[in-house]
């Protein structure tokens, strides 16, 4: 078995009065495309935000690359952050900057590379995610939804991370663009040896792109594993997602 990249154990999260996670655990291994699936409000984004150190659970532990993320010095935390890229749900590009400038910003913030080299790297990343070369000069408002996702992905990949976090990468995209984006994620995983963690509602993504996933519900992990393993579990939430919804998709 491949080495473990992320190990979350017994995570308990309270936000205000709300108990969001009541002891959730999951194990994500190198080179996997791993998804967090669950109904709206089941705490998927919150869990993702805890993994990337934007929020802190009340108890439990998260180890990434073997390090307990609750137990890092500032320098260690900064070093660890450089090893992952994040694609937020909205894309979160700066609207006043071009695609090229959006990506450049990251290199300026985290590296001392000379401008000419940064420019070459930006062009490479834009090419890597399948955007046309001229996209470097475009503003986010001039891009389609699919192109915005790709531009945000190019930025997430700027520092050559080994780990990629995606929050609802195909939401808002039409079915064809969604499948193309899924295919891109798989290609990049293979090409760059990435480990990918994504929050998704997209059952096509679960069926065709994801290796394993955790189904969140009732504040817990209802099921975890490959699609086949999860489907073998007898639980109303599993039925809800995979019988009702697949029935709906087939019309
Ligand atoms: N700052 C906060 N204070 C209190 N409650 C919050 C806060 N942020 C989120 N919540 C609540 O936490 C729960 C989980 O939110 P989260 O965004 O993680 O869900 P989600 O599974 O990502 O949902 P969606 O699929 O709609 O994106 C929700 O009930 C939400 O209302
Ligand atoms: Mg969410």
List each model region and its residues.
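Conserved ABC ATPase "signature" region
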Residues: 116-134
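Catalytic Walker B motif of ABC-type/P-loop ATPase nucleotide-binding domains
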Residues: 164-167
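Conserved catalytic motifs of ABC-family nucleotide-binding domains
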Residues: 160
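Conserved ABC ATPase signature
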Residues: 139-143, 147
């Amino acid at each position: 078995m491949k080495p473990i990249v992320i190990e979350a154990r017994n995570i308990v999260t309270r936000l205000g009065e709300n108990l969001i996670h009541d002891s959730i655990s999951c194990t994500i291994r190198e080179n996997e495309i791993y998804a967090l699936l669950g109904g709206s409000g089941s705490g998927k984004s919150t869990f993702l935000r805890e993994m990337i150190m934007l929020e802190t659970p009340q108890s439990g532990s998260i180890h990434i690359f073997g390090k307990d993320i609750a137990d890092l010095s500032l320098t260690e935390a900064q070093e660890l952050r450089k090893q992952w890229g994040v694609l937020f749900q909205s894309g979160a590009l700066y609207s006043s900057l071009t695609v090229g400038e959006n990506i450049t910003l990251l290199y300026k913030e985290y590296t001392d590379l000379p401008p000419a080299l940064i420019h070459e790297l930006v062009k490479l990343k834009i090419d890597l995610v399948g955007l046309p070369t001229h996209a470097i000069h475009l503003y986010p408002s001039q891009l389609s939804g699919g192109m915005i996702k790709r531009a945000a992905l190019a930025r997430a990949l700027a520092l050559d991370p080994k780990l990629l976090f995606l929050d609802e990468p195909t939401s808002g995209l039409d079915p064809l663009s969604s499948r193309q984006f899924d295919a891109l994620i798989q290609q990049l995983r293979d090409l760059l040896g990435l480990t990918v963690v994504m929050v998704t509602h997209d059952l096509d993504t679960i069926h065709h792109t994801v290796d394993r996933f955790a189904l969140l519900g009732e504040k817990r992990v209802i099921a975890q594993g490959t699609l086949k393993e999860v489907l073998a579990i007898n639980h109303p939430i599993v039925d809800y997602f995979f019988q009702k919804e697949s029935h709906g998709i087939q019309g």
